[in-house]
A protein has these predicted regions:
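FIC/Doc superfamily catalytic core
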Residues: 1-211
Length: 211
């Protein structure tokens, strides 16, 4: 639902200063983060999309589950239903579609598979055209998710391997933050400012993180 790529959405939030408003791109990133970090439910989705009433979220998800077809068909119906009722809510439609897909597949958490593969032009499609676009998007999104999972596993292993070389007090807690977050600013680490910056520089020098 946004023209920015995933990294640009992330940077819009993490490169902002304390007290700054995140802006549309940062808000989109926060919505996805909140939607994915908890088990899929109407409550967790409302937390991610506070402008949508829980009742509306439930209606869209229920309408998708009432239709014929499998998980992809349900997700396509959710996209169509949300954009029919709220034509500008593209980000919300994608989040709820991936939530519907996760529910249909029995997953606890949503994975942004459709969002990774659907193009803006696809969101203007309806019926069979949208259904086929969702199938194509799922193939693209699943391949990208597998590639990213492999990359993250390798990077996490590398970060754990260099942890014993870190002497700063609190380095273990800092490393845990790097392992569980997409990006971490030095000021967010549980260390004094100078120590946090030195630790980040050390991790970059060791090739364990990227600046």
């Amino acid at each position: 639902g946004r023209p920015e790529r995933a990294g640009e959405l992330r940077d819009a939030l993490h490169l902002s200063r304390p007290g700054d408003l995140p802006g549309p791109a940062g808000e989109s990133y926060l919505a996805w983060q909140r939607a994915a970090e908890r088990s899929v439910s109407v409550g967790s989705l409302h937390r991610a999309l506070p402008r949508l009433a829980p009742e509306r979220i439930a209606e869209w998800l229920d309408a998708g589950s009432a239709g014929q077809g499998g998980p992809v068909a349900r997700a396509a119906m959710v996209v169509e239903g949300v954009l029919r009722d709220a034509p500008r809510a593209e980000a919300s439609a994608l989040i709820l579609a991936d939530a519907a897909l996760a529910q249909s597949l029995g997953w606890d958490h949503l994975v942004p598979l459709l969002a990774a593969g659907l193009k803006r032009a696809d969101l203007r499609k309806r019926g069979e055209e949208l259904y086929l676009a969702c199938h194509r998007a799922l193939v693209v999104g699943a391949a990208e998710a597998l590639r990213l999972a492999d990359e993250l596993a390798r990077r996490a292993a590398q970060l754990r391997a260099v942890t014993p070389k870190l002497r700063a007090k609190g380095a273990g807690d800092a490393v845990e933050m790097f392992l569980t977050r997409d990006a971490v600013a030095p000021r967010a680490l549980p260390l004094p400012d100078r120590a946090a910056r030195r630790l980040c520089d050390r991790l970059v020098d060791l090739g364990a993180v990227r600046e």
